Amino acid sequence: MHWLADYWWVVLIILVGMILNGIKELRRLDHKKFLSNKPEIPPHRDNNAQWDDDDDWPDKDKKK
């Protein structure tokens, strides 16, 4: 970890470069074009549908 104390500025320059490249790529993104050609999202599949009908709670109106 001694090298990190000596070269902390190199790590900082790399991080700043990564952030700037990310900002540049986000500026190139055309969100209006994406929203106009947005694909249809398939309906959500409920994986717990088979257990939804099972009622684990006791029935309050049921008499013993």
UniProtKB/Swiss-Prot annotation:
Keyword Glycosyltransferase listed: no
Main location: membrane
Spans traversing the lipid bilayer: 3-23
Region (Disordered): 36-64
Pfam families, sorted: UPF0370
The keyword Nucleotidyltransferase belongs to this UniProt entry's keyword annotation: no
Keywords: Cell membrane, Membrane, Transmembrane, Transmembrane helix
Subcellular location(s) of the protein: Cell membrane
Membrane topology: Single-pass membrane protein
One GO term describing the cellular component: plasma membrane
Protein family: Belongs to the UPF0370 family.
Record protein name field: UPF0370 protein YE1145
Taxonomic path: Bacteria, Pseudomonadati, Pseudomonadota, Gammaproteobacteria, Enterobacterales
